[in-house]
């Protein structure tokens, strides 16, 4: 039965026939569904105009506009209840604005995202699953709701039958939906990660409402410096082109402008490709298309590349971290909205919002994030989080030594690559052989996250033969990591997914296709493989000769025909296998690291609630492996200890053999607290 709870019954009687009751008449169990309709998207400048509650038997709309009920009137009836919502992160923000902080919530959108992480919807052209309310209701219960009124309900409110029906529908079968999803969560072994994420979104909603403190004056000064730096690099680029490529020099005399001008626009990728080609800097990607993307041009050692990348970085600071941010400052704070999870369980920012996770880490930028007057910033981060997690999962000896003894992994890899360093300790290598340590650094990161010899060949411009030698050296140093990765891979291709922390799972992309290709490839005999390789070489030979303008006739036409008939399924099979192997090394580490930070944030938020520090100790950002808080000066030591302890507890909860370190500091800005 549907009921409207209002002080203005006559208003709704003009719209249609409805059932009515009072707040006291509501029959609510321990678990209820909840939704809110609001006048806009942001709690700091909008409000709730109705709350909908559902029990599975009855649904209630409580009206909160036109001098009707207030949210505080509803609070006594929902305090202590378990609340089920869909994207309840949104509703929590508005409830927090009314000083109501539910202790236990569940979210059907989170459940859907966790269940179908990485999976493809076979009923929708194998596109990724969608998780909006309508899509989940249709998929799980076969119920189709008309969501047309969703776009305008903040304007028309409950003034027409369709918006009233829409509001009832949002809670009508929500408990049933949650029960169906929960059965799948339990049978699939997802319960622990689901519970964590439902606990975590309470903290995430708080972080959204806290906002990130920023000094508008400091940001404006940074903007001025960034523009000046960008113009400086623009001039460097233009003068270099003028001096070295006379065909692009504008020689027309201008009595009022003595600059070295060029007749090419450096903001035009098409025109700049011609400039790069004139410098004989390769611009072809793996598909043969021209690009001046960093990953393509950085393979060249030409000095113009370094200048260009410096200009691009300077320009990026202006276009992305300049006026765009400044315009969104509200009372010396920035706000954003988060997506609770991506496929690695990491946090992300919702599309169209400021990306709090992507601010440059330089001191100039970070020092713009200044605590409000009388406050300080408290920052705590993990020490080598991903190395610790990878070492704990894999048991790799080199990584474990790095965690336990403080060994430098870049130095360890440098010793393998450069035998002359074998007898030197870390300190000597860092001081006297910085170039060789640096040479080991980039490939080591690439390999640790599932890259291959081909990856560093493409990204670093290293000859392929040398890249294979470097890869083999890394595999020798980190044999334990690869042995573990192979085990994860072998389990994953049997199950069709990678499992990591708390039952978090990632469905292998295009797994059905992989199995199809695998069957066909495994059916190829030894003799057929010989023919395939022979045909491949002959096919490549003809291609190379034609590129040189020379005629070439196949020596082994039958082998070439066989190669061409099999090359798609063979290449696709090995491409997917390589992608899976990369994911098996990377995803479990990323997912476990994400769970560590989410548990730490949840512990901290619960502590803030329990100790009545709401809106005093604020969680203002969590980025990768750190938590950033703001608090009054007199609470800085209490906050420092609490953040540090939360991170240690959350981090070590997910480790079996090792311990992780976390160090907190405070200062007037994010940068000075690091």
Regions found by a protein language model. Give the residues of each.
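Short glycine-rich phosphate-binding loop at a beta-alpha junction
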Residues: 82-87, 265, 381, 628-630
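Short, contiguous acidic/charged loop-to-helix segments that flank catalytic cores in large enzymes
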Residues: 296, 321-329, 339-342, 360, ...
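Conserved "right-hand" nucleotidyltransferase catalytic core of DNA-directed polymerases
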Residues: 1-24, 28-29, 33-38, 42-45, ...
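Conserved catalytic core of nucleic-acid polymerases
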Residues: 205, 209, 282, 339-340, ...
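Hydrophobic, well-ordered secondary-structure elements that form the walls
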Residues: 345, 381, 414, 456, ...
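Short, conserved secondary-structure transition motifs
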Residues: 110-120, 266-267, 274, 496, ...
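C-terminal structured "cap/appendage" subdomains that terminate the fold
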Residues: 607, 611-663
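Active-site-proximal helix-loop-helix substrate-binding element of RNase H-like nuclease domains
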Residues: 2-12, 42-186, 196, 411-427
């Amino acid at each position: 039965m549907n009921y409207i709870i209002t002080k203005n019954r006559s208003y709704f009687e003009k719209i249609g026939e409805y059932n009515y009751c009072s707040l006291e008449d509501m029959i609510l169990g321990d678990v209820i569904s909840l939704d809110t309709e609001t006048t806009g998207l942001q709690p700091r400048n909008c409000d709730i105009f109705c709350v909908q509650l559902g029990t599975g038997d009855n649904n209630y709309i409580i009206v909160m506009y036109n001098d009707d009920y207030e949210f505080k009137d509803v609070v006594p009836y929902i305090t202590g209840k378990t609340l089920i919502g869909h994207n309840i992160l949104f509703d929590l923000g508005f409830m927090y604005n009314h000083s109501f902080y539910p202790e236990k919530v569940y979210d059907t959108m989170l459940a859907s995202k966790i269940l179908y992480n990485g999976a493809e919807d076979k009923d929708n052209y194998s596109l990724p699953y969608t998780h909006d309310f309508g899509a989940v209701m249709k998929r799980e219960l076969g119920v189709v709701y008309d969501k047309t009124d969703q776009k305008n309900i903040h304007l028309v409110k409950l003034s027409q039958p369709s918006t009233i029906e829409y509001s009832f529908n949002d809670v009508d079968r929500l408990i049933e939906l949650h029960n169906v999803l929960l059965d799948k969560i339990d049978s699939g072994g997802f319960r622990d990660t689901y519970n964590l994420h439902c606990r975590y979104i309470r903290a995430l909603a708080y972080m959204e409402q806290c906002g990130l403190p920023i000094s508008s004056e400091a940001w404006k000064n940074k903007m001025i410096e960034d523009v000046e730096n960008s113009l400086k690099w623009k001039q460097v680029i233009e003068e270099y082109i003028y001096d070295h490529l006379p065909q692009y020099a504008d020689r027309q005399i201008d009595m009022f402008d003595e600059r070295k001008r060029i007749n090419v626009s450096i903001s035009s990728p098409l025109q700049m490709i011609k400039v790069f080609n004139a410098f004989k800097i390769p611009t072809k990607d793996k598909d043969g298309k021209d690009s001046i993307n960093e990953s393509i041009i950085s393979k060249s050692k030409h000095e113009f590349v370094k200048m260009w990348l410096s200009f691009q970085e300077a320009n990026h600071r202006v276009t992305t971290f300049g006026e765009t941010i400044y315009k969104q400052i509200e009372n010396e704070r920035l706000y954003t909205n988060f997506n609770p999870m991506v496929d690695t369980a990491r946090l992300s920012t919702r599309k169209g919002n400021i990306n709090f996770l992507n601010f440059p880490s330089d001191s100039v930028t970070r020092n713009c994030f200044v605590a409000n007057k009388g406050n300080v910033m408290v920052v705590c981060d993990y020490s080598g989080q991903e190395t610790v997690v990878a070492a704990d999962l894999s048991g790799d000896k080199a990584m474990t030594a790095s965690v336990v003894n403080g060994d430098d992994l870049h130095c360890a890899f440098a010793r393998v690559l450069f035998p002359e360093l074998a007898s030197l300790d870390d300190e000597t290598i860092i001081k006297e052989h910085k170039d060789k340590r640096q040479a080991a650094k980039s490939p080591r990161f690439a390999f640790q996250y599932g890259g291959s010899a081909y990856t560093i060949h493409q990204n670093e411009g290293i000859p392929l033969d040398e890249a294979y030698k470097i890869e083999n050296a890394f595999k020798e140093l980190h044999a334990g990591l690869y042995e573990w990765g192979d085990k994860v891979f072998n389990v994953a291709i049997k199950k069709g997914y990678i499992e990591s922390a708390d039952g978090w799972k990632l469905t292998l992309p295009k797994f059905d296709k992989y199995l199809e290709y695998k069957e066909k490839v495994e059916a190829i005999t030894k003799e057929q493989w010989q023919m395939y390789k022979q045909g491949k070489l002959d096919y490549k030979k003809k291609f190379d000769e034609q590129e040189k303008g020379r005629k070439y006739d196949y020596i082994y036409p039958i082998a070439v025909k066989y190669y061409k008939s099999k090359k798609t399924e063979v290449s696709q099979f090995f491409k997917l296998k390589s992608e899976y192997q990369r994911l098996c090394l990377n995803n479990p580490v990323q997912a476990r690291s994400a769970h560590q930070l989410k548990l730490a944030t949840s512990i901290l938020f619960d502590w803030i609630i329990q100790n009545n520090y709401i809106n005093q100790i604020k969680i203002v950002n969590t980025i990768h492996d750190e938590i950033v808080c703001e608090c009054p000066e007199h609470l800085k030591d209490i906050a420092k200890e609490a953040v540090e302890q939360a991170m240690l507890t959350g981090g070590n909860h997910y480790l079996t053999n090792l311990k992780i370190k976390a160090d907190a500091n405070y200062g007037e800005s994010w940068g000075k607290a690091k």
